[in-house]
Amino acid sequence: MSYSSNTKNELARIEGEQSCCVRAELAALIRMSGTLQLVGSQKLNIKVTTENPAIARRLFKIIKKQYNIHAEVMIRRNARLKKNNYYLLVITHSMGSSEVLADLGIMKKVDDSFDITYRIPQELTQNRCCKRAYLRGAFLGGGSVSDPEKTYHLEFVTHHKELSEGLRDLINSFDLNAKVVERKGNYVVYLKEGDQVVDLLNIVGAHSALLDLENIRVYKEMRNNVNRIVNCETANLSKTVDASIRQIQNIQYIEGSIGINRLPDNLREVAELRVEYQDATLKELGEMINPPIGKSGVNHRLRKLDQIADRERGKSI
């Protein structure tokens, strides 16, 4: 099961919410994944679809608890897309769909017609707990979060621009930085940074998913740090090996041209040690010299040998 599905399963099992929060969550869930079906003069059915059985159970329970309505539940096979079954919950006009829509701020009856609104009702999101519940419902109905092993990305998808802007503003009321982009005829509200995704998961109550993400972040950071250290050490080792090869080649050239014995004692000693101990570091070479000298002193003498080799090569041209 995907990380996003696990997150939704966790959210679908949250219990003990107040009535105001249940209304906010239900309003968002119906708005994000529901459709309205006109079945007669001023008669509407509410249809909500989901592929997640935990969300279907939650919908059924909160509709029954809040409105004492036993929604009709059907299981459909998505044969065309060859995906999992999906669940269809229906609240018919006779069950009280109009009353539910009005209570959730989705529909208002004006004279002999319906006024469907796509704004987020302020009366449902006045309290901070209700704002959290609305975002939880929006995520259950039309949200997803990427596998944190790959990237940090959380989004809500809706057909309606006004709703997307309302979601963005509601998310940003928690000091986040959600943005809206149009994609293939839909409006996508998204967060991209790891810290922002963590904060949103905390807001909606997905604490287990949050901990999983944080554990993955720590692991990835440790892995990246190890890789950086290894790469740095590999690069340094490569430089050391290249320098050692160059120094030995220069010493061998000096031996073949003027002879190492003609070098000053301090340079001759370093040259002989460098050839004998080809894998030794500058520090180790310095400790072999009598009296011992530091890395900078060894490096200075080796550079002198490089200069002598270059000078002798110039004479042979």
Swiss-Prot record:
Q: Where is the signal peptide?
A: none
Q: Which organism is it from?
A: Alkaliphilus metalliredigens (strain QYMF)
The coding gene here is: whiA
Source taxon at top rank? Bacteria
What is the organism lineage in this UniProt record? Bacteria, Bacillati, Bacillota, Clostridia, Peptostreptococcales
| Record-linked Gene3D superfamilies | Homing endonucleases
| UniProt keywords, alphabetically | Cell cycle, Cell division, DNA-binding
Ranges of the DNA-binding region feature: 281-314
Pfam families, sorted: HTH_WhiA, LAGLIDADG_WhiA, WhiA_N
Entry annotated with the keyword Iron-sulfur = no
What's the protein called, per UniProt? Probable cell division protein WhiA
Q: According to its UniProt entry, what is the function of this protein?
A: Involved in cell division and chromosome segregation.
Q: Does the keyword Cell division apply?
A: yes
Family to which this protein belongs: Belongs to the WhiA family.
Molecular function terms in GO for this entry?
DNA binding
One biological process term from GO is:
regulation of sporulation
